[in-house]
């Protein structure tokens, strides 16, 4: 899910493949709240409540709707998907297990 409370997250990329893109949050009227240039692979994005989680190849970053980093976890190597919860915690889902990240 890419929708949080009063915002939606968008991951924009100019090319079909590649890792250069832009992470954008927009409000319910479609107006931009914040944006962040992304120069690396994004594996998954999830939003809920006031938080947005982005899984990069080497770390998990939890942002607020203004795309300010709230928490970072380095090295979740086996995580394939993330599920952000309303309290800012993130369920990190792997092929055969899941862990809860509590910032």
PLM regions: where:
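Residue position within the beta-strands of beta-propeller blades
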Residues: 10-12, 54, 92
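Surface-exposed loop/turn elements that mediate protein-protein interactions on large endomembrane-trafficking
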Residues: 17-38, 58-76, 97-103
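Short loop/turn segments that connect beta-strands within the blades of beta-propeller domains
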Residues: 19, 48-49, 56-58, 86-87, ...
